[in-house]
């Protein structure tokens, strides 16, 4: 009896989507990360073209292509978040960093040397490790559970801290230091991820009750509308500051740093709200830490050494001189 009860409890605490849903969600997440990786490059290209002509980037077709790609990528992320845990989807954004760097080397003529290519390989390898070790089960699967989590004092306190930091950054720090310090705009966009990603996940959960016409569908509808409003406001502010950053800084540098900071803050918010780490063992936790570290090292190689004129030909010449 005790064993059966324990097994039942374990099954209830580790509910998750079917393997087919996980595979579909992963596929959508991978495609979305690649699409998102192209958005910053296309938008930057449009901004550069508009500056060259002396017109607004709002009139440039390439900028609009990047904006549409961003919308498509966000829709893909929304679908992925409804199928698999947040902690599995968010780190896969790493795939967009090397893809964006390769695209930028062609469209924006940004440098990508041998170390940058090695960084692309490490980012992809780290993403595979993250997929293998990420939790596949959900800890919050109903609208009632979501409401309980949203009113948790720890999560409410975290959101209040994030909101205060955003107000400080937007109204005091950004006007003075935003154009010269890339971390200001990145911090604003990343902190907003504490609202956008949980809201996206919550909308998916609330929508299930609405579509199935459950007795709590009225409450679910109200919750869904509130989360939609939060999501909409967050995306608008994010969009504004992403374009401000692209006007002032290198697109691939912004994309790389943004990935690391955004992923860290989103995983923190998701850990507090959804408790998706509760079903992760020590081995998988260490595996995810190693995967995220590998991705971060790859991103550093792509960006920090991009100005070095370093290639295989020069390595061979150096070896010949040494011999």
UniProtKB/Swiss-Prot annotation:
Location in or out of the cell: Cell membrane; Early endosome
Lineage of the organism: Eukaryota, Metazoa, Chordata, Craniata, Vertebrata
Cytoplasmic membrane side: 43-60, 104-111, 175-177, 240-253, 306-323
Ranges that cross the membrane: 22-42, 61-81, 83-103, 112-132, 154-174, 178-198, 219-239, 254-274, 285-305
Family: Belongs to the NIPA family.
Stretches assigned to the Extracellular side: 1-21, 82, 133-153, 199-218, 275-284
One term under GO cellular component: early endosome
Membrane topology: Multi-pass membrane protein
SUPFAM superfamilies hit by this protein: Multidrug resistance efflux transporter EmrE (SSF103481)
GO terms under biological process: magnesium ion transport
Keyword S-adenosyl-L-methionine attributed: no
Major location (coarse): membrane
GO molecular function, one term: magnesium ion transmembrane transporter activity
Quaternary structure and interacting proteins, as annotated: Homodimer.
Function: Acts as a Mg(2+) transporter. Can also transport other divalent cations such as Fe(2+), Sr(2+), Ba(2+), Zn(2+) and Co(2+) but to a much less extent than Mg(2+).
Induction pattern: Up-regulated by low magnesium ion levels.
Reactions this protein catalyses: Mg(2+)(in) = Mg(2+)(out)
Keywords, comma-separated and alphabetical: Cell membrane, Endosome, Ion transport, Magnesium, Membrane, Transmembrane, Transmembrane helix, Transport
Protein's name according to its UniProt entry: Magnesium transporter NIPA1
Tissue: Widely expressed. Predominantly expressed in neuronal tissues. Brain, heart, kidney, liver and colon (at protein level).
């Amino acid at each position: 009896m005790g064993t059966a009860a324990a097994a039942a409890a374990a099954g209830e605490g580790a509910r998750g989507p079917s393997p087919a849903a996980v595979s579909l969600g992963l596929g959508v997440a991978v495609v979305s990360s690649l699409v998102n990786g192209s958005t910053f490059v296309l938008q930057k290209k449009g901004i550069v073209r508009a500056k060259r002509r002396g017109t607004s980037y709002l009139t440039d077709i390439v900028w609009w292509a990047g904006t549409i790609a961003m919308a498509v990528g966000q829709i893909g992320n929304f679908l992925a978040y409804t199928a698999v845990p947040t902690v599995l989807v968010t780190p896969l954004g790493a795939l967009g960093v090397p893809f964006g760097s390769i695209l930028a080397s062609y469209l924006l003529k940004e440098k990508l040397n041998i170390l940058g290519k090695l960084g692309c390989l490490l980012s992809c390898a780290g993403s595979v490790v993250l997929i293998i070790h990420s939790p596949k089960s959900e800890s919050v699967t109903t609208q009632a559970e979501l409401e309980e989590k949203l009113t948790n004092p720890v999560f409410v306190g975290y959101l209040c801290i994030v909101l205060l930091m955003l107000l400080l950054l937007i109204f005091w720090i950004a006007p003075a230091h935003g154009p010269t310090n890339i971390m200001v705009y990145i911090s604003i966009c990343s902190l907003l991820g504490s609202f956008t990603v949980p809201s996206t996940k919550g909308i998916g959960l609330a929508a299930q009750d609405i579509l199935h016409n459950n007795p709590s569908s009225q409450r679910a509808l109200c919750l869904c509308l509130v989360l939609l409003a939060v999501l909409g406001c967050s995306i608008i502010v994010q969009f504004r500051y992403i374009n401000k950053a692209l006007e002032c800084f290198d697109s691939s540098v912004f994309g790389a740093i943004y990935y690391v900071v955004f992923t860290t803050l989103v995983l923190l918010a998701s850990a507090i709200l959804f408790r998706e780490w509760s079903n992760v063992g020590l081995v998988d936790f260490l595996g995810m830490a190693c995967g995220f570290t590998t991705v971060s090292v790859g991103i550093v190689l792509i960006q920090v050494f991009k100005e070095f004129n370093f290639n295989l030909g020069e390595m061979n010449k150096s070896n010949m001189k040494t011999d």
